[in-house]
């Protein structure tokens, strides 16, 4: 029981630093742009030819999806997102690699940042808008970026871990083959010691 509690405490302490830092960055960026963009003409600040900072409230999910269901979305998304965050935290506690730990921390940090918006403001504030010629990418925020970064880290960690496991399994298989051949030589050849040594080298 004590080792489990210790693990939970250490996981909470380590993840909290990452998650809280990401939430603070997300909330400060939203606060700054909410305070400054509302006074801009057209509620927009042009940064480059392909990047604008815009004043947008998202009543749907990430990147403005499902915003047409705004009359139901806030309560539903508050409940479902809270459940998802709790489940992700459970997975993070069980994570066995630094990559998966970091990935879950980023996803949780981004999700919590948007949850705070939805709880206190009734919608998520989005302000980053990429566009090129006739193509316009959905408006998003830093919390969405953190979620994407976390997912990328988790995918990379999954394939890296899978590769290590496969290589280890292959190594164990090769060792088993050598042992089987050595045993066969011992049983069939009195002078098998030299051959066994050559196999092991």
From Swiss-Prot:
<keyword id="KW-1003">Cell membrane</keyword>
<keyword id="KW-0378">Hydrolase</keyword>
<feature type="transmembrane region" description="Helical">
    <location>
        <begin position="97"/>
        <end position="117"/>
    </location>
</feature>
<keyword id="KW-0472">Membrane</keyword>
<comment type="pathway">
    <text>Protein modification; lipoprotein biosynthesis (signal peptide cleavage).</text>
</comment>
<feature type="active site">
    <location>
        <position position="144"/>
    </location>
</feature>
<keyword id="KW-0997">Cell inner membrane</keyword>
<dbReference type="Pfam" id="PF01252">
    <property type="entry name" value="Peptidase_A8"/>
</dbReference>
<comment type="function">
    <text>This protein specifically catalyzes the removal of signal peptides from prolipoproteins.</text>
</comment>
<feature type="transmembrane region" description="Helical">
    <location>
        <begin position="135"/>
        <end position="155"/>
    </location>
</feature>
<feature type="transmembrane region" description="Helical">
    <location>
        <begin position="73"/>
        <end position="93"/>
    </location>
</feature>
<keyword id="KW-0064">Aspartyl protease</keyword>
<keyword id="KW-1133">Transmembrane helix</keyword>
<comment type="similarity">
    <text>Belongs to the peptidase A8 family.</text>
</comment>
<keyword id="KW-0645">Protease</keyword>
<dbReference type="GO" id="GO:0005886">
    <property type="term" value="C:plasma membrane"/>
</dbReference>
<feature type="active site">
    <location>
        <position position="126"/>
    </location>
</feature>
<dbReference type="GO" id="GO:0006508">
    <property type="term" value="P:proteolysis"/>
</dbReference>
<dbReference type="InterPro" id="IPR001872">
    <property type="entry name" value="Peptidase_A8"/>
</dbReference>
<dbReference type="GO" id="GO:0004190">
    <property type="term" value="F:aspartic-type endopeptidase activity"/>
</dbReference>
<keyword id="KW-0812">Transmembrane</keyword>
<protein>
    <recommendedName>
        <fullName>Lipoprotein signal peptidase</fullName>
        <ecNumber>3.4.23.36</ecNumber>
    </recommendedName>
</protein>
